[in-house]
């Protein structure tokens, strides 16, 4: 959709919900932009798992998910994080609604081939009809990063991946991947632009690692699949790192 902006909120979503964030949202709405949010919640999921004495394990920046971890993830994302986000919008009289994969089968997913990750999936289809209907009524949609497979089983989905799939399905003009750092760093320096063709080299040389690996892979997918621009940053008001489609920089 033209004029659609997708924003992925970081794992500590409340850190992103500053007054500057809401000012930018209202400015975009005044300019007839349509806003979709996909939220993470990793920080809160980890805290709940620790409180319940459930071991926390990650692999290549993704959470290893067994049945207990999946139940905690669903509970925290849908029951804690998402309502906190929608309430913050409602306090500012901004129309908003929270959605998850069970709403009209919003996010279809298949389990990843890496069985070591457990019940972790990849989005295979985004049913955009409901999102588009809500956006046409100027209602911001807030989506939890979970998927449901063909057997109607829930799967944990990386929030960056989910945001990129949603942005691509909507042909968004921009995707902001908000995180806890102001962009992709090489040492202490923020990299202004990265071509998708350069990402593999940056990974092999250790410039990107940990959670930034799946984040950049997702950003590259979005840049190559119909999203106008992809920005990794800690704030809607900062320039961050732009991910460009294929063409090498410099």
Swiss-Prot record:
InterPro entries: AceGlu_kinase-like_sf, AcgluKinase_fam, ArgB, Asp/Glu/Uridylate_kinase
Enzyme Commission designation: 2.7.2.8
Pathway(s): Amino-acid biosynthesis; L-arginine biosynthesis; N(2)-acetyl-L-ornithine from L-glutamate: step 2/4
Disulfide bonds: none
GO BP term, example: arginine biosynthetic process via ornithine
Site (Transition state stabilizer): 8, 215
One cellular-component annotation, GO: cytoplasm
Keyword Cytoplasm: yes
Catalytic reactions on record: N-acetyl-L-glutamate + ATP = N-acetyl-L-glutamyl 5-phosphate + ADP
First-level EC class: transferase
Superkingdom classification of source: Bacteria
Gene Ontology molecular functions: acetylglutamate kinase activity; ATP binding
Matches recorded under Pfam families: AA_kinase
Protein location: Cytoplasm
Location (main, coarse): cytoplasm
Keyword terms, alphabetized: Amino-acid biosynthesis, Arginine biosynthesis, ATP-binding, Cytoplasm, Kinase, Nucleotide-binding, Transferase
Residues at which substrate binds: 41-42, 63, 156
Keyword check for Transcription: no
Physiological role: Catalyzes the ATP-dependent phosphorylation of N-acetyl-L-glutamate.
Family statement drawn from the similarity comment of this UniProt entry: Belongs to the acetylglutamate kinase family. ArgB subfamily.
PANTHER family with a match to the protein in the record: N-ACETYLGLUTAMATE SYNTHASE, N-ACETYLGLUTAMATE SYNTHASE, MITOCHONDRIAL
Name of the molecule in the record: Acetylglutamate kinase
Organism: Listeria monocytogenes serovar 1/2a (strain ATCC BAA-679 / EGD-e)
């Amino acid at each position: 959709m033209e004029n659609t902006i997708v924003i992925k909120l970081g794992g500590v979503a409340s850190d992103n919900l500053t007054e500057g964030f809401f000012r930018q949202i209202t400015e975009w709405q005044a300019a007839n932009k349509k806003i979709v949010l996909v939220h993470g919640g990793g920080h809160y999921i980890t805290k709940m798992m620790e409180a319940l004495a459930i071991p926390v394990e990650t692999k290549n920046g993704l959470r290893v998910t067994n049945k207990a971890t999946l139940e905690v993830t669903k509970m925290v994302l849908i029951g804690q994080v998402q309502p906190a986000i929608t309430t913050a919008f409602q306090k500012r009289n901004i129309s908003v609604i929270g959605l998850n994969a069970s709403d009209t089968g919003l996010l279809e997913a298949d389990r990843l081939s890496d069985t070591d990750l457990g019940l972790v999936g990849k989005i295979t289809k985004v049913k955009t009809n409901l999102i588009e209907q809500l956006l046409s009524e100027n209602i911001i949609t807030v989506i939890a990063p979970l998927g449901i497979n063909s057997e109607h089983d829930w799967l944990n989905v990386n929030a960056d991946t989910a945001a990129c799939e949603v942005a691509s399905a909507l042909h968004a003009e921009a995707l902001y991947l908000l995180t806890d750092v102001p962009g992709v760093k090489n040492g202490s320096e923020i990299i202004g632009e990265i071509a998708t063709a350069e990402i593999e080299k940056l990974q092999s040389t250790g410039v990107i690692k940990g959670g930034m690996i799946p984040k950049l892979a997702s950003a590259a997918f979005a840049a190559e699949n119909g999203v106008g621009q992809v920005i990794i940053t800690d704030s809607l008001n900062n320039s961050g790192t732009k991910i460009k489609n294929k063409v090498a920089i410099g």
